[in-house]
Swiss-Prot record:
<feature type="glycosylation site" description="N-linked (GlcNAc...) asparagine">
    <location>
        <position position="398"/>
    </location>
</feature>
<feature type="repeat" description="LRR 2">
    <location>
        <begin position="95"/>
        <end position="118"/>
    </location>
</feature>
<keyword id="KW-0433">Leucine-rich repeat</keyword>
<comment type="similarity">
    <text>Belongs to the RLP family.</text>
</comment>
<feature type="transmembrane region" description="Helical">
    <location>
        <begin position="795"/>
        <end position="815"/>
    </location>
</feature>
<dbReference type="Pfam" id="PF13516">
    <property type="entry name" value="LRR_6"/>
</dbReference>
<keyword id="KW-1133">Transmembrane helix</keyword>
<feature type="glycosylation site" description="N-linked (GlcNAc...) asparagine">
    <location>
        <position position="28"/>
    </location>
</feature>
<feature type="topological domain" description="Extracellular">
    <location>
        <begin position="20"/>
        <end position="794"/>
    </location>
</feature>
<feature type="glycosylation site" description="N-linked (GlcNAc...) asparagine">
    <location>
        <position position="170"/>
    </location>
</feature>
<feature type="glycosylation site" description="N-linked (GlcNAc...) asparagine">
    <location>
        <position position="183"/>
    </location>
</feature>
<feature type="repeat" description="LRR 4">
    <location>
        <begin position="144"/>
        <end position="171"/>
    </location>
</feature>
<dbReference type="InterPro" id="IPR013210">
    <property type="entry name" value="LRR_N_plant-typ"/>
</dbReference>
<dbReference type="InterPro" id="IPR003591">
    <property type="entry name" value="Leu-rich_rpt_typical-subtyp"/>
</dbReference>
<feature type="repeat" description="LRR 8">
    <location>
        <begin position="244"/>
        <end position="266"/>
    </location>
</feature>
<feature type="repeat" description="LRR 17">
    <location>
        <begin position="459"/>
        <end position="482"/>
    </location>
</feature>
<feature type="repeat" description="LRR 5">
    <location>
        <begin position="172"/>
        <end position="193"/>
    </location>
</feature>
Amino acid sequence: MGCVKLVFFMLLKLDLLEFKNMFTVNPNASDYCYDYTDQRMQSYPRTLFWNKSTDCCSWDGIHCDETTGQVVELDLRCSQLQGKFHSNSSLFQLSNLKRLDLSFNDFTGSLISPKFGEFSDLTHLDLSDSNFTGVIPSEISHLSKLHVLRIHDLNELSLGPHNFELLLKNLTQLRELNLDSVNISSTIPSNFSSHLTNLWLPYTELRGVLPERVFHLSDLEFLHLSYNPQLTVRFPTTKWNSSASLMKLYVHSVNIADRIPESFSHLTSLHALYMGRCNLSGHIPKPLWNLTNIESLFLGDNHLEGPIPQLTRFEKLKRLSLGNNNLHGGLEFLSFNRSWTQLEILYFSSNYLTGPIPSNVSGLQNLGWLFLSSNHLNGSIPSWIFSLPSLVVLDLSNNTFSGKIQEFKSKTLSTVTLKQNQLEGPIPNSLLNQESLQFLLLSHNNISGYISSSICNLKTLMVLDLGSNNLEGTIPQCVGERNEYLLDLDLSNNRLSGTINTTFSIGNSFKAISLHGNKLTGKVPRSLINCKYLKLLDLGNNQLNDTFPNWLGYLSQLKILSLRSNKLHGPIKSSGSTNLFMRLQILDLSSNGFSGNLPERILGNLQTMKKIDENTRFPEYISDQYEIYYVYLTTITTKGQDYDSVRILDSNMIINLSKNRFEGHIPSIIGDLVGLRTLNLSRNALEGHIPASFQNLSVLESLDLSSNRISGEIPQQLASLTFLEVLNLSHNHLVGCIPKGKQFDSFGNTSYQGNDGLRGFPLSKLCGVDDQVTTPAELDQEEEEEDSPMISWQGVLVGYGCGLVIGLSVIYIMWSTQYPAWFSRMDLKLEHIITTRMKKHKKRY
């Protein structure tokens, strides 16, 4: 027997070592590590110290039965394991396991093996956040002794409706079920374990009506069903069996069928209620005021109205969110709640609150997050806010607060956004001495004074928005040198002067730089070439005196470039590289002194403009993940007017070269930029014809070629541009008949004035019989009769979301990016045939 037992332990050790050797140890594999109570854990490589010279039952993460010596527990959570988890893993030789935890590792691309269902004695199984993928096998439902099952992951795990029902039916001993973010796409059956204490099913595509039996589970402590918009929840009108035990109820973004019933008053143990985005309406439900043990109450993103009650019974409150509702009245209740000594978060943004913030508020020494943005609050910001010792985030933006920004007592500030108010005075020194400040947004106020070089001491700063104030002086030289985490810099629309003398250091993180609307002089700083992540550069409306900085084209991420309204001059020369400005979506060089021909090589490099993204489900914004605190600002001219665009859609593509001294012909290569929405070449000295290739600009909405020397006829093919909303061809030398078509028939006289040779609607000079323009359909028929070679028009309707934009807006906010696209182009021979038939002895365009 001794030999048999020895062999058994040797085999057991070999199985464990073989399992260890399947994976590498990588600290990044357990980056985000939490225990089941959502407390952050420290990861460490448990298997690193396993070796064959020691007893495997003493190894970290392993627990053996004292009698049999069998491994009964294997806890490898947060063990930094990385690699493929194979279905023939030696792990499955440990047939006596009762607890198995492999959570918070990285098994990317691995399927959950059906062999997990062979651990018949298993009571705890946790495979969470380890990047498993595919379908959860039905064999998991064979683990009839399970008390805890956690398989939550963001890596496209799914569980078919049948398997979900089977799992709930067979696992009758379950205490905790966590399938967070697993695609279930099913209703919830009513036959599930009566022992459940924790039921976590958020983001699981649940639908139908939640069985009322869930609320009568006598041991239920935590119910999490959030983010299932197709799930309908009806709360019992009578007392729940779980009333005494239920501590956390998360039903955010589900469909609440009826009003909150009086039965809520009996939830005496409830600590946290998340009921945002549930279409709640009317006044804040009165049954909630009896929840005297509540610590977290989130009712935001609903349609609640009326004043905010005093809430004096919530003495244990830590987190309160009523934002994005229709609440009105003042904030007087803050003066009456002196017992809120534990309050940490107060979120009342986006309501209709009015009046000043009460000045006699006390007892909020633990308040760390205060959100009152987008209301109608006024008056000065009271001193108690600046005196909060634990303040981390302050958002009072988009109100009408006035007065000075006082010095902050807190040393732990992460975000301060006071933009869009009427604040004045200098930037307080206490803001410039923060060790953890990441977002500082003070734009659109009346802040004055100089920008101190102390701002460079903010080592963690990611967004600095001081635009649209009265700041003067020079830009601190250190801004581009010492703030290595700074992503977005907006100093636009101030009174800053001098040269841009900052040196942008190698390895910086800038994504957006806007210095628009100042009095800056000198040249475009060459060190900008070090901003390799830059997406937006706006130096417009200054007094820069330089030639075109062609080297900016090497910034491979650049999407928006505005150099408008400066003193830039000379021809735009480009190198032989075809990789310059490839991702550019907005190019604004207007109101300068550029001369020579239009930059044909640069226009030919604009690869992003050469395609229409018809498959994007939702529009993306240039400001990506930081949009919550900051949006880019740039001013562009489109449809004849200047606009400050607060958000630039990823699908918006604009070229503005107006008000320069460009001459020569319009390059036909512009017709390859099929994604172009706005083209403005007005007020130059351009000549020649309008290229027929413009017919390919199928999503073009605004075309301005006015005040040039363009001659010839308007190409009849332009009548196919069904999205064209604004057209200005005035003050040129155009002749012939104006094309007829749905869009062209909507343009008035001003689109064509100053062209004495033009005829046809809407002008008073009509086209005679001899001048009648042949439509594209007629041309096709005639060419077929003559058997002439041609490429026929083929309109491919791909569908569209919002159609034409309402009003004059540069951002054209559309919630679908699918548009009609016309892919066929006439070749030169066809062009010759068409123009000859339209007007004998005329030149080709």
